[in-house]
């Protein structure tokens, strides 16, 4: 999977960094967790403060557009993000931990 950053801007009012990207891949669409790990590695970000907001793909296309938010601190992340989004991203982290432990 190859990821190209199309926009990377700081949002000091919301204490976060907003990143838009294009992901090119072969085969199946990458999971939220795969995208999150690749983006955090590329941008040297903390994965616990990274939220994958959206991944949009057209049917039959091997390219996806995505939007990721990287928060400065956990307090800001909990203040601005919906509980469902936080839970989805935490579930993805838990799955990674279980896979690494096996």
Curated annotation (Swiss-Prot):
Pfam families: Ribosomal_S24e
GO annotation terms (biological process): translation
Keyword Transmembrane: no
Family, as annotated: Belongs to the eukaryotic ribosomal protein eS24 family.
Top-level taxon in the UniProt lineage: Archaea
Gene Ontology molecular function, alphabetical: structural constituent of ribosome
Organism per entry: Methanococcus aeolicus (strain ATCC BAA-1280 / DSM 17508 / OCM 812 / Nankai-3)
Protein's recorded name: Small ribosomal subunit protein eS24
PROSITE patterns in alphabetical order: RIBOSOMAL_S24E
UniProt keywords, alphabetically: Ribonucleoprotein, Ribosomal protein
GO (cellular component) term, any one: ribonucleoprotein complex
């Amino acid at each position: 999977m190859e990821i190209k950053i199309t926009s990377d801007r700081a949002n000091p009012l919301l204490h976060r960094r907003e990143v838009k990207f294009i992901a090119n891949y072969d085969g199946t669409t990458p999971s939220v967790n795969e995208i999150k790990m690749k983006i955090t590695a590329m941008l040297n970000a903390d994965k616990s403060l990274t939220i994958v907001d959206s991944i949009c793909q057209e049917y039959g296309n091997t390219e996806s557009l995505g939007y990721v938010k990287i928060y400065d601190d956990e307090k800001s992340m909990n203040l601005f993000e919906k509980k469902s989004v936080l839970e989805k991203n935490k579930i993805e982290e838990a799955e990674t931990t279980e896979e690494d432990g096996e």
